Amino acid sequence: MRHCGDCTLCCKLLPVHDGVLINGKRMQGNLDKAAGERCRYQRHTGCKVYNTALMPTCCKMWNCRWLGNDDTGDLSRPDRSHYVIDIMPDYVTVVDNTTGNQQKVEVVQIWIDPKYPDAHRDPALRRWLERKGRMALVRFNSSDAIHLMPPSVASDGQWHELDGKSEGREHSLTEIVDALST
């Protein structure tokens, strides 16, 4: 079993919104921080509130993919690779424009340390994504991201980094609803 050691990268990169919704209004929890901000409970030796009543629920539920050690043997510890992998229960459908074949692909979030903006190009990470057949939403902060598509998903068998910005026309509401309902 792997251990965090002095790695606290998840405490820096992940957003933590520990407040609760009451009558549609967000009430402040004991911690509310944006992605990329250091947690106020973080110390050089780790988390000051780890396994205490003050530990935010989302931190208790966080499951570092590297710690899992089941399928990440060739990945470096997050503070050395400069990213954390967040397994999302989300999928996208990729359609081959030539054949019309559809493929349902799992998506993971990869939170990148802003000091290392090319960390998502780590060969070990790309091998892991390719082996698992997963796409990645590479998050640089709460609002900036790209999609990383491995060759096993792309119709041309190449890696693709997609910024999500469309240079073409905008889609109508009807087109969006039709696309979502298929």
Locate each region found by the language model.
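Short loop/turn segments that flank or connect secondary-structure elements
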Residues: M1-T182
